[in-house]
Amino acid sequence: MVPYPPGTEPDILARDLGVHLNKATGKVFVIENRPGANAIIGTDNIAKAKGDGSALLMVDSLAVSTNPLLYSNLPYKWEKDLKPVTTVAGVNLYLLVRNDFPAKDYKEFIAQAKKANGDTNVGTGGRGHVTHLGMGLLAREEGVNFTYIPYKGMAPATNAILGGETDAMLVGGILASQHVDGGKIRVLAVGADKRTELLPNVPTVQEAGGHANSIPTTTFALFAPGTTPDDTVKEIQEKVDAALKKLTSELETVPPDSFNELVGRVATEGN
């Protein structure tokens, strides 16, 4: 289950992973997209599914842990109804601006945003989406104000900046690399400790003169229904780990115990 539209980064990762799991296990893994409500619709579907190892959720782990802070009437309780399996990929976020935005680099972008005093329009994948929270973090760290424009997913948000409707946004590397040569956007910085192989000409936010923590990273992860036995979760994690080693992307998995601690810590810090 992918609670995002087709063509988004978690969808692409899930489909790549599914191909390798099909080969490794001989079982057919079907990718189902149920986007909406900042991943709540698809997440609820898995929260209520049978815990027999046949249903998994590929989701931004921040959405799981921060949605309870943003929405008071969630149809599930993630601590009880979902069980962390493993991370699939840590994803760097890149700051994009429309090509004609009057700033040639990150420092000028911040200066322009301060001068605009809230009139810089920032597109996001929706209320509470990691791109919304990420731009909020950037605003706090750099002391600027933005006008946030939520869209129903990353596809319309990306189309908006390509069409000049918004000034800036955060995206993952796959989306950034798809559009960087089109002449309609520019990539100013990446939230990473070092430059990435995907876009080596893009400086880190610290290299670009910003605060080191201004642009966060995110993690796409697998969850199982909360009733899934621990030994089944461990078996799934081992198969996923083996499948990930065959992918060409730089991915890192985390064992279920430490991943559970990670998700819990994110929620605690959010509170």
Q: What is the role of each PLM region?
A:
Residues 1-14, 36-38, 123-130:
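Extracytoplasmic "Venus flytrap"
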Residues 1-5, 29-30, 55-58, 83, ...:
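Short, well-ordered beta-strand elements
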Residues 7, 46-47, 135, 161-162, ...:
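Hydrophobic residues within well-ordered alpha-helices
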Residues 7-26, 132-140, 179, 241:
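Short, polar/charged alpha-helical segment
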Residues 21, 48-54, 69-156, 168, ...:
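Hinge/capping helix and adjacent helix->loop/strand transition within the periplasmic-binding protein
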Residues 34-42, 91, 126-127, 149-159, ...:
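Short helix-initiation/N-cap motifs at beta->coil->alpha
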Residues 62-73, 137-141, 168-202:
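A ligand-binding cleft/hinge motif common to bilobed small-molecule-binding domains
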Residues 104, 176-250, 254-257, 265-271:
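C-terminal lobe and pocket-closing loops
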